[in-house]
């Protein structure tokens, strides 16, 4: 008797065996419907076997097979299996997340028949004789049916169609879907609208000449300053791939998927371009997946999950703003789309082109190791006015809720000239640090020489490297001042202060809270463009993708929260944010000014960024990372647990730590185990959050440790919700 082995979308690191009925045939990669507990689940077949270790009386039969063929190409199956193994995620969850929601729910993977309304002979007669003159809506509907009206498309309302059907004026006609590849749909049109194509400058032409003759897999890093014309390179590279008859996948950050981006691609090409964005419903997402798989679409533009789209013949992958943190999935299985795209391209033997004005340190290290090939665009396509940049030393400065008097005066000067001002708060990776406003002294752990993190809830200082903690000091350990402050400021708090200081100017605060409702962001942006708001407050949402010609002053308000963050990547993100922010000022004809507020103007990395630019900053930061044995010169994995009861989450991670200490003794003496300790934001939505960080200089050894954990610990029953994040980007 054959048995079928199923991967189910459950957080368990194993497969499930079922009886295969004699009348049923299945193939690996097809979906099946199976009983699971009291529910029915859609799973994916991973094997058909003749033997099983499960007692026969405990086995249940497969209820139904949903596909005749595998939903995954051999390359895609290999790729997703590799991803599940690398991120130590259950294969059932990975395969399920790689499919559109409708397929996870059991809908057909093949395009369905379309049902149309068509006039009957009586209906044709009614039209010819004008029998519906008094029923205007029915007449319009019957005329639409004559031209071919799809039943699901219902602009007239179901009552109109019911009335026409009752009169026997219409009938339903089934039509098989007509599948034409994107090449067939071109007919006599050229692939490219050549009138839209720009002439490349000397640097762009040199870069493109290298891309043009790419054969097979190459990981290209296009390192181009803002405004250097990376998008034009993308477009001409896509043209080359389309000329080969192949498809292209373009991955963009969440906040980079704007109508302007899409319209530029659509203006250039006469091919079918599908876009995967958050406003699509589940049916529309399924249709995009089906069109790509059958070769009907030529280009797919989407955010990170678009990577899992099935293609008929994928020829290249492009990743714009490859350094952007939104390419890392932050719920479910925590993959990084950038890293997976490189792996997938290598498996398919196709090029991957990654563009960035501020490449992450991991990518620059890959260039140094010869894993990536670097292409540079250092010249702006359109030269703009040079920026003035100044650092405000906050020590001894009079402050108003995070705003220095110098900044307030500069804001006043720009506003009085009728210009706009943009204030940025750096919140990502933020962990509050206690420092002295008078001299800049910080409370540091004497065991680790690292700043303590301030935990407001428990009113203590805690070291997130060795777990040491101490009470809040009453005065500065250096100068004796009682002016001890914490780094960090909220956008709402800043908005309240600005309303008091600048009561006569419009203020637009743009963050996740104020733009949560659909259409809010567009409304704020329209107010800014129309000059209704003169002061703009934002987080990274405003850092890129928007053109504000009247903004002449940009300020980074809380630089210190990044310079001494618990997250070792915070300085890198600050530098990337600074380069993006600097690009917001002086985009029109007027000169722009950029201000940074800090208690530590002499910080070496800050100085290298301001005086020598991002590239030198990144090289210096890499040297520092290597000395500290931090990624990319080591590998990390982060366990996160949360529970309504703090001690439950702590106890679970303590149990994990105890097991891992034994593994360390047995096979990984260089393994560092940090924690368990409360997360920097230790309570969220009523849940207490704890974490346990692992680090090892060898990626392979760390994965051996995680494989042992997966085998021995991962499937043990617990009421505490926990996740494993391999190569974590966010330690907060």
Residue ranges of predicted features:
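Short proline/glycine- and acidic-rich turn/helix-capping motifs at secondary-structure junctions
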Residues: 672-685, 721-732
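Inter-lobe coupling/hinge segments of SF2-like helicase ATPases
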Residues: 192-201, 216-650, 690-693, 700
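Small-residue-enriched segments and motifs
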Residues: 4, 18, 43, 389, ...
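Nucleotide-binding motor/catalytic cores of P-loop/tubulin-like NTPases across gene-expression machines
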Residues: 667, 685-688
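Intrinsically disordered or highly flexible coil/loop and linker segments, enriched in small
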Residues: 89-93, 104, 150, 420, ...
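Short amphipathic alpha-helix segments
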Residues: 615, 650-674
């Amino acid at each position: 008797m054959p048995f079928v082995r199923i991967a189910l979308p459950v957080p368990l690191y194993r497969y499930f065996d079922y009886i295969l009925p004699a009348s049923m045939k299945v193939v690996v990669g097809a979906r099946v419907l199976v009983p699971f507990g009291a529910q029915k689940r859609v799973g994916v077949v991973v094997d058909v076997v003749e033997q099983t270790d499960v007692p026969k009386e405990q086995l249940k039969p497969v209820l139904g097979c949903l596909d005749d063929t595998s939903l995954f190409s051999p390359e895609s199956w290999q790729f997703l299996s590799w991803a599940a193994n690398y991120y130590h995620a259950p294969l059932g969850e990975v395969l399920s997340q790689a499919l559109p929601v409708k397929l996870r729910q059991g809908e057909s993977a093949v395009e369905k028949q379309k049902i149309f309304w068509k006039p009957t002979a009586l209906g044709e007669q009614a039209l010819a004789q004008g029998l519906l003159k008094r029923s205007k809506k029915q007449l319009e509907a019957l005329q639409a049916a004559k031209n071919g009206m799809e039943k699901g498309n219902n602009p007239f309302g179901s009552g109109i169609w019911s009335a026409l059907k009752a009169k026997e004026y219409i009938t339903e006609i089934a039509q098989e879907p007509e599948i034409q590849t994107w090449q067939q749909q071109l007919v006599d049109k050229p692939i490219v609208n050549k009138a839209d194509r720009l002439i490349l400058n000397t640097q762009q032409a040199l870069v493109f000449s290298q891309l043009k003759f790419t054969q097979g897999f190459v990981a290209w890093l296009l390192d181009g300053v803002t405004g250097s014309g990376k998008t034009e390179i993308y477009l001409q590279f896509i043209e080359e791939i389309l000329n080969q008859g192949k498809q292209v996948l373009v991955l963009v950050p969440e906040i980079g998927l704007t109508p302007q981006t899409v319209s530029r691609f659509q203006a250039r090409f006469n091919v079918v371009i599908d876009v995967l964005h958050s406003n699509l419903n589940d049916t529309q997402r399924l249709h995009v997946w089906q069109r790509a798989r059958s070769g009907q679409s030529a280009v797919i533009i989407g955010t990170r999950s678009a990577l899992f789209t099935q293609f008929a013949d994928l020829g290249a992958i492009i990743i714009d703003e490859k350094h952007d943190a939104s390419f890392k999935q932050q719920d479910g299985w925590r993959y990084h789309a950038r890293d997976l795209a490189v792996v997938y391209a290598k498996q398919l033997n196709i090029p991957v082109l990654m563009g960035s004005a501020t490449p992450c340190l991991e990518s620059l290290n890959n260039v140094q190791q010869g894993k990536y090939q670097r292409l540079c665009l250092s010249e702006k396509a359109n030269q703009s006015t040079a920026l003035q940049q100044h650092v405000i030393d906050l020590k001894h400065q009079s402050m108003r809720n995070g705003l220095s008097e110098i900044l307030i005066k500069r804001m006043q000067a720009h506003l009085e000239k009728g210009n706009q001002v943009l204030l940025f708060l750096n919140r990502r990776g933020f962990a509050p640090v206690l420092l002295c406003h008078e001299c800049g002294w910080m409370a540091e752990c004497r065991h680790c020489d690292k700043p303590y993190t301030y935990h407001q809830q428990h009113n203590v200082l805690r070291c997130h490297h060795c777990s040491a903690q101490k009470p809040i000091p009453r005065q500065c350990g250096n100068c004796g001042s009682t002016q001890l402050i914490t780094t960090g400021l909220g956008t709402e708090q800043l908005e309240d202060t600005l309303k008091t200081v600048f009561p006569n100017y419009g203020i637009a605060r743009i963050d996740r809270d104020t733009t949560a409702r659909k259409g809010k962001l567009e409304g704020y942006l329209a107010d800014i463009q129309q000059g209704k708001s003169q002061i703009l407050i934002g987080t990274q949402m405003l850092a890129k993708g928007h053109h504000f010609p009247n903004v002449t002053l940009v300020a980074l308000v809380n630089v210190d929260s990044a310079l001494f963050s618990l997250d070792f990547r915070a300085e890198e993100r600050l530098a990337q944010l600074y380069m993006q922010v600097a690009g917001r000022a002086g985009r029109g004809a007027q000169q722009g000014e950029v201000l940074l507020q800090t208690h530590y103007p002499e910080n070496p990395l800050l100085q290298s960024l301001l005086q020598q630019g991002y590239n030198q900053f990144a090289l210096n930061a890499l040297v520092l990372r290597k000395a500290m044995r931090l990624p990319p010169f080591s590998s990390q994995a982060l366990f996160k647990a949360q529970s309504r009861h703090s001690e439950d989450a702590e106890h679970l991670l303590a149990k994990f730590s105890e097991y891992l200490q034994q593994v360390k003794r047995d096979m990984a003496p260089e393994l560092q185990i940090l924690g368990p300790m409360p997360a920097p934001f230790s309570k969220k939505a009523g849940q207490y959050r704890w974490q346990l960080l692992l680090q090892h200089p060898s990626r392979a050894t760390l994965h051996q440790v995680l494989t042992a954990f997966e085998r021995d610990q991962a499937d043990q029953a617990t009421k505490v919700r926990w996740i494993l994040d391999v190569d974590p980007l966010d330690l907060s």
